[in-house]
């Protein structure tokens, strides 16, 4: 059974002080409309676990989904969407930044990028930002179905080349529509959980 199959909504928060008690957490982050919520739904084999919108910027809080009793999937606000009030955008930046750099229970980051437009400036900033935390990042080049196989291979090779200086970063093609790459994501995330010390092993209840 997929490690994501038991995912269910737990809580949503808008301030660091409201974060739930610590469990092992894997967070999803990406530019607005990169396919982040669709990726979560596809991995969980659900249609409406995470809200999917054609309007960028709809994920405005940190949403927690529990896996068993000891693990969370975390859906973070999308970045790069300009059509929100400055005060709201500033709050997102602070909330996202503090969570990524200070959340001790965060064991890995799934960074979603549109395969047609990978490694935009804000994506690169996110990689540098999270580098400080010293935890692994796995990039999903989403919407791969929009590219031919030849184009996919070219994009994947180019992204890997540009990430040569990031030893803790891995990358793959992914399509929510075609369910391409689901098994690879599961293996990566399971590896993160399996690497936890036994007393914190969030896979025990999955």
From Swiss-Prot:
Cofactor field: Mg(2+)
Entry keywords, A to Z: Cell cycle, Cell division, GTP-binding, Magnesium, Metal-binding, Nucleotide-binding, Septation
Top-level taxon of the source organism: Bacteria
GO molecular function: GTP binding; metal ion binding
Transmembrane segments: none
A cellular component term, taken from the record's GO annotations: cytosol
Listed GO biological process terms: division septum assembly
Entry binding sites for Mg(2+): 37, 59
Domain EngB-type G as annotated: residue spans: 22-195
Family annotation (NCBIfam families): GTPase_YsxC
Biological function: Necessary for normal cell division and for the maintenance of normal septation.
Protein family: Belongs to the TRAFAC class TrmE-Era-EngA-EngB-Septin-like GTPase superfamily. EngB GTPase family.
Name this protein carries in UniProt: Probable GTP-binding protein EngB
């Amino acid at each position: 059974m997929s490690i994501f199959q038991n995912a269910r909504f737990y809580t949503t928060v808008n301030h660091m002080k409201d974060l739930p008690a610590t469990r092992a957490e894997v967070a999803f982050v990406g530019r607005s409309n990169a396919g982040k919520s669709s990726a979560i739904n596809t991995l969980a084999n659900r249609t409406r676990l995470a809200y999917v919108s054609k309007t960028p910027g709809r994920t405005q809080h940190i949403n927690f989904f529990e896996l068993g009793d000891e693990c969370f999937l975390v859906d973070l606000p999308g970045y790069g969407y300009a059509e929100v009030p400055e005060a709201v955008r500033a709050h997102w930046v602070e909330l996202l930044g503090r969570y990524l750099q200070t959340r001790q229970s965060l064991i890995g980051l799934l960074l979603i990028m549109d395969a047609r437009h990978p490694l935009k400036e804000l994506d690169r900033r996110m990689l540098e930002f999270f580098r400080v935390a010293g935890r692994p990042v796995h990039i999903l080049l989403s919407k791969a179905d929009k590219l031919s196989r030849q184009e996919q291979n070219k994009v994947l090779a180019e992204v890997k080349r540009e990430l040569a200086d990031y030893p803790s970063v891995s990358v793959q093609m992914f399509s929510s529509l075609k369910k391409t790459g689901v098994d690879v994501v599961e293996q990566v995330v399971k590896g993160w959980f399996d690497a936890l010390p036994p007393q914190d092993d969030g896979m025990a209840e999955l």
